[in-house]
């Protein structure tokens, strides 16, 4: 089902392995057409169905644009680029070499994700001739409208939040959005940088935004949202810091968070293998940041 957010912004539920409300894919339709996020390689057929449901052909796609290149966001980038011969992919400069030569990217993903990486599937390389490197502030004209790159590291060093007028495609820079709970929780992998994550949230907060478009999952009204996001990140880091100082395990710390945040434990089981232990992984990412600070 295609959701029409506005005259130019559309989105659909990718449903990887049948999991609903896990990955949103967005499309901007102007004189040029931009596809924002592709999902993993294993969901390429679902992505093609979504594009077809939009009434578009693969030749209509001009730009394929990830917020960052984690497998659940852009593992299928090379697969769809092989089919969209008129398209160019727009990526962070730090992602450029990884998407043109995927072996390091793939091996790093397998090391971090284990079996989930295999479920997502191996990415395919994209020729450098079809890549655009987007520095901070880079603007891409789509005709009557444009997208601007706001570098938002923290979750990943190669993360971009794409600004579209008073809307932002936030990827994972503002956590995971659970509309049923009206809250976003952090998602902080092993190389998480808490200082940069908070700076990125502040950069987004300085803009007069009306909507945040989450990959996980769906649009969120921006009013008050980033204040909630920053407060939640700070609460989690405070809880993790207390646990770190007491030499608690990551499992013990996540249980404290489950007790402190209504609905949090249930979200850990809401998307099968895709979501399992996500919050434990976030605690471990925060612990790793604290350890690096102390090193």
Language-model features, listed with the residues they occupy:
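Metallo-beta-lactamase
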Residues: 40-42, 60-72, 99-151, 157-223
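Internal alpha/beta domain cores that form substrate/cofactor-binding pockets in large enzymes
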Residues: 191-199, 203-204, 212, 220-251, ...
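C-terminal regulatory/interaction regions
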Residues: 242-295
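Metal-dependent catalytic neighborhoods of phosphoester/phosphodiester hydrolases
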Residues: 74-84, 101-102, 223
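Conserved beta-strand hairpin/beta-sheet module of binuclear metal-dependent hydrolase folds
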Residues: 1-54, 162-172
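Divalent metal-coordination and catalytic microenvironments
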Residues: 8, 28, 37, 47, ...
């Amino acid at each position: 089902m295609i959701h029409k957010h506005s005259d130019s912004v559309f989105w659909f539920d990718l449903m990887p392995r049948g999991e609903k409300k896990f990955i949103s894919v967005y499309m901007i339709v102007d004189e040029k057409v931009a596809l924002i996020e592709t999902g993993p390689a294993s969901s390429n057929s679902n992505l093609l169905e979504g594009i077809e449901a939009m009434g578009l052909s693969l030749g209509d796609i001009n730009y394929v644009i990830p917020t960052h290149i984690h497998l659940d966001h852009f593992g299928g980038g090379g697969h769809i680029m092989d089919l969209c011969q008129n398209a160019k992919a727009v990526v962070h400069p730090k992602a450029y070499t990884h998407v043109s030569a995927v072996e390091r990217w793939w091996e790093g993903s397998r090391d971090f994700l284990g079996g989930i990486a295999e479920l997502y599937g191996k990415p395919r390389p994209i020729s450098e001739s079809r890549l655009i490197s987007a520095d901070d502030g880079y603007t891409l004209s789509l005709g009557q409208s444009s997208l601007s790159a706001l570098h938002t590291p923290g979750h990943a060093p190669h993360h971009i939040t794409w600004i579209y007028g008073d809307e932002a495609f936030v990827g994972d820079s503002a956590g995971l959005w659970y509309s049923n709970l009206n809250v976003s929780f952090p998602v902080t992998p092993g190389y998480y940088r808490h200082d940069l994550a908070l700076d990125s949230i502040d950069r987004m907060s300085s803009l007069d935004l009306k909507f945040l478009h989450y990959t996980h999952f769906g649009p969120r009204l921006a009013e008050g949202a980033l204040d909630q996001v920053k407060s939640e990140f700070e609460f989690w880091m405070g809880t993790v810091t207390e646990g770190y100082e007491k030499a608690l395990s990551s499992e013990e710390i996540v249980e404290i968070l489950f007790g402190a945040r209504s609905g949090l434990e249930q979200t850990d089981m809401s998307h099968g293998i895709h979501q399992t232990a996500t919050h434990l992984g976030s605690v471990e990412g925060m612990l790793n940041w604290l350890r690096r600070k102390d090193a």
